[in-house]
């Protein structure tokens, strides 16, 4: 699984650094690759995260694990 977190200015202002830190904590448990990314073009809905090509919006440190579980369950 590949997780890409938007590091664009809008997402940065909305907390992308904290989201990255949360995903770093979750890496050992869920075994995925984590990358920073340029803007996904959905700035008003940030923080945006792409997981295996699927875009998620309004990602927070609090809902990051729930999103990972959803992707793993639904493929």
UniProtKB/Swiss-Prot annotation:
Cofactor binding mode and count: Binds 1 [2Fe-2S] cluster.
A GO term, aspect molecular function: 2 iron, 2 sulfur cluster binding
Binding site for [2Fe-2S] cluster: 6, 11, 39, 43
SUPFAM superfamilies for this protein: Thioredoxin-like
Domain of life, per lineage: Bacteria
Cofactor: [2Fe-2S] cluster
Thermal properties of activity per the entry: Not very thermostable.
Keywords, in A-Z order: 2Fe-2S, Iron, Iron-sulfur, Metal-binding
Record's function text: Might be part of a multi-protein complex, possibly involved in metal cluster assembly.
Protein name, per record: Protein TM_1420
């Amino acid at each position: 699984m590949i997780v890409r977190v938007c590091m664009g200015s809008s997402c940065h202002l909305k907390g992308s650094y904290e989201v990255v830190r949360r995903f770093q904590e979750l890496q050992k448990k869920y075994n995925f690759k984590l990358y920073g990314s340029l803007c996904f073009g959905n700035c008003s809905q940030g923080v945006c995260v792409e997981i295996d090509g699927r875009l998620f919006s309004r990602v927070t440190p609090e809902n990051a694990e729930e999103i990972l579980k959803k992707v793993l369950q639904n493929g």
